Amino acid sequence: MWAYADLCNRLFQAVNQASQFKDLKIYYFHNCFYDQLFTAPQCKWEDKVSTEWVLHNLKPEYKVIVVGDATMGPAELLEPGGTLDYDHENDKAGIDWIKTLKKRFTSAVWLNPLHEKLWDYDASTRTIQIIREQFPMFPLTVQGLEAAIKELRKGEA
């Protein structure tokens, strides 16, 4: 995902400047989010913020856009302790954090920088399929972002 950090930053800054969002908050993670998110793309521990804090301090009405390729080792997504950060043990599986976020923020989508043709490619993209069961997934393109925003605005007056 590091290859897409600059693209994501430019894309969301442009959206923010176009007044698409009243309040834009950006958090980062590597592969999957667990009990910590980060306020800088390098995902250093000095830039961490508790995922629980985010869940409890942002209103449920927030629109959430998750950006990631959704590819990782299945253990990273499905097992407690699956994080690749050997200095930190996650007690809750990544999929459980994903479900918790989706339950808290019902208007949530996932933008994926991988070409859509690769989403159903083979067993190595199994994690994409699992995440797609939780979030509507769109390509990380201008058209994908437009479709994602349309999805987020469903049900608005």
Which role fits each region the language model picked out?
Residues P60, A70, P74-A157:
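Von Willebrand factor type A / integrin I
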Residues D23-I65, T71-L77, I95:
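Von Willebrand factor
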Residues F12, N16, V54, G94-K99:
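Short amphipathic alpha-helical segments and helix-helix/interface helices
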Residues W2-A3, V54, F138-Q143:
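Short, basic, helix/turn surface patches
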Residues Y4-N9, D35-A40, A75-E79, W119-S124:
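A short acidic (Asp/Glu
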Residues M1-F21:
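An amphipathic, basic-hydrophobic helix/alpha-beta surface used to engage anionic
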Residues S19-L24, R104-S107:
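A generic structural motif
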Residues Q17, P41-C43, D87, I130:
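A generic membrane alpha-helix/interface feature
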